[in-house]
Amino acid sequence: TSTGYHNVFLGANAGDLNTTGDNNIVIGYNADASSNSADNEIVIGNTSHTNARVYGLRTPVTATTADTTLTANDSGETFVFNDTAATFTLPDSGAGDITGVYFHFIVLDDTAGTKRIQCADSTNEDLIGSVRSVDTDTSDATASFASQVSDEFHQITFDGTTTGRAGSKVTVTNIAADKWHVEGTILCTGSPATPFS
């Protein structure tokens, strides 16, 4: 390294091609960043990790009152519906490069209104999986609602009553290009109804 700063190179010949790159972590024999001037990269062996997660630390919880478009960098976070109406738009998974990205959603606001999770591409992207619904104004009777590939559903709506109210939690995981898996438990009042559409 001739002028690069704050780099960590561990292993024989690790980072030996770096000249001006800053803030890189390179581990392993002959491992190098993507270029001699790359910044902010983590390379273990010959694999570059653009988003590293340190296990054992807390993940962020974000309360939201407005429409929000998520990115792959938000993966692992918990998002809380903290208002009558808000829409979370998932990142577009059409390129197939965000497999494994996941988000947790919790409804905290208990008023009627449209709280929604939706795919970025409503034509090509689909939600598959199921949720269990618990009717909170009877004996906690349960019902299940499934979303199959053939259904071509692309959004989940919590309406504050029959399709989800405060206490509902859903996890959405990208499993392939244009495919998101959904699992969770929703609380409802009245006659349980599917949150998928």
Name each model-derived stretch.
Residues 1-57:
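Glycine- and small/polar-enriched repetitive beta-structure motifs of secreted/surface proteins
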Residues 40-43, 166-174:
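Extracellular disulfide-bonded cysteine-rich modules/repeats
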